Amino acid sequence: KKIKYIVTIARGTSDCAALYSSYIFAKHLGLPTYSMPPSIITLEQSKFDFSEALVIVISQSGKSADLVECERKSRLMGAHTVIITNNVTSPIIKEANYFLNMFANEEKSVAATKTFTQTLLVLIKLVFICLGKKNINDDIKKLSEIIVNDSSNQWKTDIIDKNVNTGFIIGRGVGFALSNEISLKFKELCQEMIEPFSSAEVMHGPKSLIENSFKLFLLGMNDKSGLTVNQDVNELKNYTNLIYEISTNQNVKSKLFYPSNKISELDSVILMSKFYPWIIRYTTAKGLNPDDPRYLTKITETF
């Protein structure tokens, strides 16, 4: 079947992974990828010709009624559907054309963490195998060793101003997708309004919001898009002193360093594996309980 474009459907953290996929599918496979709001199908009941589309539904639990309905209707509109979930008993996989398991084991935390990194790995493997680069499996096997044996500094919580609850997390390319997930965790766990922005979009207007009592997290990845973020640092330093660089450069002032695997896509997994333990410590340092985020439940039902 000739696939000419990809549609992703997801919510929350899974949608951040879907955004990530849009970059790597377009970059490596030349396939335009669009994140479809589930309500377009479930509430608006819009019709599409999906005969040349691959529809990828990402859901940790696979239980949200809107995502189950989106998969069913997408198939009826001619799509080949792929389900990425962590639940092998999910009703969403019964009729889908393909099922890709996250293999994250049970995730008890309310805020999704390891299912995000596992979803990234599934997406990365899918892309590289489509390119005929099956040796990506060997590179992935080395990841756990890199993460576990990382002797670099553990991110400290005391370098971040806990009294400032607003700011931006700025990235570009896959870094922007990761910025969306990082932003979500600041909101879910820390009750901080850290908004994600592309570094290019910030320059088009939102930088006007920046003042000295404003946090700026700058996420630099080892790819062409990430380099542009690093180039913006000097200008942004004119607007606030609260700048925190997340980088593979061990000399960054803010000490938010993560080691590089030399494959930018896999660097994403290393970075998030470093971020998640830190955000737990940071949340605790603020006097909040990361296992009991306010108003949230493990499975969110929407339609």
Task: Name each model feature, range by range.
Residues T117, L121-I124, A177-N180, L271-Y276:
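Active-site-proximal catalytic alpha-helix in oxidoreductases
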Residues V252-N289:
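Structured C-terminal subdomain patch of bacterial secreted/periplasmic proteins
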Residues F48-D49, I160-D161, I210:
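Short, flexible hinge/linker loops that cap or flank conserved catalytic cores
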Residues K2-I146, S152-N153, R172, K207, ...:
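Glycine-rich phosphate-binding loops that contact phosphosugars or nucleotide phosphates
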Residues Y20-S21, E181, K185-E188, M272-P277:
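Conserved phosphate/anionic-ligand binding catalytic regions in large, soluble enzymes, centered on
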Residues N163-D232, Y239-L242:
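Acidic catalytic cores of enzymes that act on phosphate-bearing nucleotides/polynucleotides
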Residues K141, K286, P290-F303:
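A short, charged, Gly/Pro-tolerant segment at domain boundaries
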